[in-house]
């Protein structure tokens, strides 16, 4: 299964607001569970991961955002900045790391803050 950064962002937004974004309805249970487990593994959320008999993550109980989770969400919250990140960093055919995405989001937020 693949990491879905759009879903990661939606899950973080949901955790912060306690409201389910309507876009979450398009995801199946397996995809939701896997990406929720990734949030815990990445240290963006405190929680516990459930694994199948092969040790693959299949779900997670998400408790609350961590400091790092709040920081990432603060960078990714603005729809304009997120759209730019999807166009430049997350577009198909380009390899990226989470660190690269987070740095791009921080730089775009910094530019917006400084009016550059």
Region annotations inferred by a language model:
Residues 1-23:
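Short amphipathic alpha-helical interface segments
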Residues 3, 7, 11, 31, ...:
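Residue-level detector of well-ordered alpha-helical segments, enriched
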Residues 31-45:
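Basic amphipathic alpha-helical segments that dock to polyanions
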Residues 48-50, 54:
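Beta-hairpin "wing" of winged helix-turn-helix
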Residues 56-89:
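Short, amphipathic alpha-helical interaction segments positioned at domain boundaries
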Residues 76-116:
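Exposed, interaction-prone assembly regions rather than primary DNA-binding/catalytic cores
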């Amino acid at each position: 299964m693949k990491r879905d950064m759009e879903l990661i962002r939606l899950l973080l937004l949901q955790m912060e607001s306690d409201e389910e974004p309507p876009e979450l309805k398009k995801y199946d249970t397996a995809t939701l569970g896997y990406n929720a487990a990734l949030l815990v593994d990445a240290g963006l959320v405190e929680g516990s991961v459930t694994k199948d008999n092969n040790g693959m993550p299949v779900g997670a109980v998400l408790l609350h955002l961590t400091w790092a989770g709040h920081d990432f969400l603060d960078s990714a919250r603005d729809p304009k900045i997120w759209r730019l990140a999807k166009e430049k960093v997350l577009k198909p055919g380009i390899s990226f790391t989470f660190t690269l995405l987070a740095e791009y989001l921080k730089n775009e937020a910094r530019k917006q803050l400084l009016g550059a």
